Amino acid sequence: CDTSRGLSLELYPDLSAADSAATYFNNQQANSFDIIAHDSATNTGDVTFANWQWKANGGTRTTFSESGDNPGGGYQANTAAGFSIVDYTGTQATGTVAHGLGDVPKCIWVKSRGSTRSWTIYHHQMGSPAIEKNMHLNTTAAVTDYNAEYWSGTNPTTSVFGLGNADD
């Protein structure tokens, strides 16, 4: 759940599943949210839960338009913390996507929210050259070479990251 997609959708980092309905949270505050007390998936007694939370910029989304093969979408960026949440509509063509960081990202996670696809990960120290490497968060597979289909062979810059034509 996040302020880009809203409290009604969830993603699991260990699964390739698409967005799914979440009914566990309500009443989002500036710095917190309420958990629905009667829900067994998020508030069962004697069960340990983890919830990851990052505050991007309070819910203000900056939009960008599609231009040729470069997807349109938007982002929320917290430049002080060094992360952004980016959403875009893919073109299945090689292009670039704005990230709003003002610095070169060292790690990028991409997930198709509308279909069952893997989490595709870039990390600047994955190998040489890192931009030609790929791994999937939701599998145990090793880092692989990918021939530019994921990151287009284009290193991230202070304003954009590259996308290839992979359908993952």
Feature names for model-found ranges:
Residues 1-168:
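Surface-exposed molecular-recognition determinants
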